[in-house]
Amino acid sequence: MTWVAHLVRTMDGRLGAQLDIAGEGSWEIPLNGVESFSVTVGKDQLRRIDPSWWSPYRASVAVSWRREDGSLVAWIAGPITGPPTETRSTATFECRGIGAVLERRVLTAQEPASQSTSAQTEMMAGRLAYRGMSLGTIGQEVVKRGMAKVGGTLPIAFGSPREQGSTLNERTYEGHNLANNGVWKRLTELSGVRNGPDIAFRPRWNAEGWLEWVMVHGTRAQPQIAQNWTMDLDTTSSLSPVASVDVTTDASKLASRVYWTGAGEGSTTMVRVAEDRSLLRDQMPILEAVGSTSDSANPDLIREHAIAALAASRDVVTQISMRVDGADQRCEIGRWRVGDAARVTLGDEWLTVPAGTSPKRIISAKGSWSSAMVDLEFQDDAIPTPDDYLDEEEIE
């Protein structure tokens, strides 16, 4: 069991040469973020490969975990983001997930038909309106629109169900709002509202042996990405695959009231407020926070951002860090993914977390190519219900 790296062509996922990993390198996968990793190879090998196969953004690197039976599980993949850093004998490529390409795509209702002023004015006057869809389904449409461009093809498949209905969500993206219409930015906003879906682009090898990224996301009923296996980690057992465990806490974002601003200037700026007065019990002083989505004039969306920010600010954030053996069947790389829930058992030595077994969400994973050891970060899930908080219309 080991790591295996390949070059692939970004636009269609065509498989290129296998790379001999010559240095340690590292990788990191955050929840709802863009992955990052580096791969070092010998320059002698690169000289035997057409440079177009390691050209920034034209080419990608896919690193897979080779299981005991020899099968490959694609683990992390994405474009090479710049020329390699060189020593006399090696070249190191910095890579990011496919989100690095989506960061460089802009939502427009149509492609400019020409370079004429009238064509560009028409493009700016257009708008994209998505109605009667779950947030995850809107995310799918955003990605599809981002690929519907000359040179926009990407091997992205969609692995989560579409949800449509008249009582679901709507989003409108104005053509003139180019600075805020980045595809990745809009996906991040969809995840960031109350009960917003987790979104991930997970690489896999298809039946033809080419690479594709599968967009998966939560649903209206379950914002977390569906999983078919649950990891069980017992930190109290001497036979556990857990090598180390640490607990950290952060109270810097505690708040019982959040002000969220939207579009507008001066006294016309849109503001929505969310608060939880139950947090003021037992002589707890009020703590306030301010956030902004300056490009939105949608009052419901601004309110959702305020409520989501308040939900994330209600409690002290407790984070559990573990180092696990990713070659162990109980937590083998590829059986779990960032975003999964795991059963975590802790002892009674911790002051800030209770002893016992409880579900925790994997919010990040990182490691290196020199070993199978993986550093995992866990947090509790915190999903508010629609009636949890007051907004400004209800505040006396």
Question: Where are the model-predicted features located?
Answer:
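Solvent-exposed, acidic/flexible segments
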Residues: 73, 128-136, 176-184, 250-253, ...
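Charged- and aromatic-enriched interaction segments used to assemble
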Residues: 98-247
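A structural detector for beta-sheet-dominated domains
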Residues: 8, 40-42, 64-66, 81, ...
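Short beta-strand and beta-hairpin "edge-sheet" elements
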Residues: 65-96, 344-379
